[in-house]
A protein has these predicted regions:
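Acidic, contiguous internal or C-terminal segments within carbohydrate-active enzymes
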Residues: 140-144, 149-194
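Short, surface-exposed beta-strand/loop "edge" segments at domain boundaries and coil↔beta transitions
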Residues: 42-44, 157-164, 226-231, 243
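Short, exposed beta-strand/loop patches in secreted or surface proteins that constitute
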Residues: 17-18, 25-27, 133, 137-144, ...
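Active-site cradle of extracellular carbohydrate-active enzymes
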Residues: 111-157
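Short, hydrophobic/aromatic-enriched beta-strand segments in well-ordered soluble domains
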Residues: 1-5, 151-155, 236
Length: 246
């Protein structure tokens, strides 16, 4: 064995919390980006739970830092707010020049989440009712590149049947070259075994949906938030036995 120098590796997986955007936890690799909603959003009374996602194209390099910086630029929004007083149409056009909801050549956020499971999140289910803990409470980044991103999210205690302080912990890993997160979900203070549901929100109920319990996967073609954005091919796969898929 000989001593050597490590080879530099380009960053292909990374992420961080964005306190400047209501505590978003956002992460990406060379193919796709995601975010989970944080405590500052919940403090405003909003309810977000499922993953949001960012499409990427034309680059393998990280883009979320740039997307967030442009979306949140105070000077840009100052110009927009001034324009809205006299020319709302021009103000809207200005927003389109920097918004991450518009593709500027490297991808965008054209996915809608709201109070749903979003892009393939899991939750407890009681009597056909999904139990949402809503936004995460704490976060800890365990791996931050260059080829793997891992974050541990812990959620607020919630009441589940007779248990009053059930806490979800979610360990999320995204590797370079993968379109899919690997997620391990656990619950503390839960005395009774309960079903866990994993879902993808259907923005177009009559769209192309495949749910295969025997095969352990489900897929969905999402129409995105606008007709000019194309479609997003969603999916989830399960290493454990799936009892029911619908």
């Amino acid at each position: 064995v000989q001593a050597g120098a490590p080879v530099d590796v380009e960053v292909r997986a990374c992420g961080r919390q964005y306190p400047e955007r209501l505590d978003d936890m956002a992460w990406e690799n060379d193919l796709v980006g995601f975010r989970a909603y944080g405590p500052a959003l919940q403090a405003r009374g909003e309810r977000g739970f499922g993953y949001d996602l960012f499409t990427k194209r034309g680059t393998a390099a990280p883009v979320l830092e740039d997307m967030y910086a442009k979306e949140l630029d105070a000077d840009s929004w100052k110009q927009v707010n001034e324009l809205r007083k006299t020319d709302p149409k021009a103000a809207d056009e200005l927003v389109r020049t920097f918004s991450y909801h518009i593709d500027h050549g490297y991808g965008m956020d054209c996915y809608a989440v709201g109070p749903t499971l979003g892009a393939g999140v899991s939750a407890l289910m009681v009597n056909d009712t999904i139990i949402y803990p809503w936004c995460y409470k704490t976060q800890e980044v365990l791996d931050n590149g260059p080829l793997r991103f891992t974050v541990k999210l812990e959620f607020n205690p919630l009441a589940v049947k007779g248990d009053t302080a059930v806490v979800e912990t979610r360990l999320i890993t995204l590797d370079a070259g993968s379109h899919l997160n690997r997620t391990a979900v656990s619950y503390s203070n839960l005395k009774e075994s309960l079903p866990i549901v994993t879902g993808i929100v259907l923005h177009e109920p009559d769209g192309a949906v495949v749910a295969d319990a025997a095969g352990g996967y489900m897929t969905y073609v999402d129409p995105t938030t606008g007709p000019d954005n194309g479609k997003i091919f969603m999916g989830a796969a399960f290493p454990a036995v799936v009892k029911e898929a619908k």
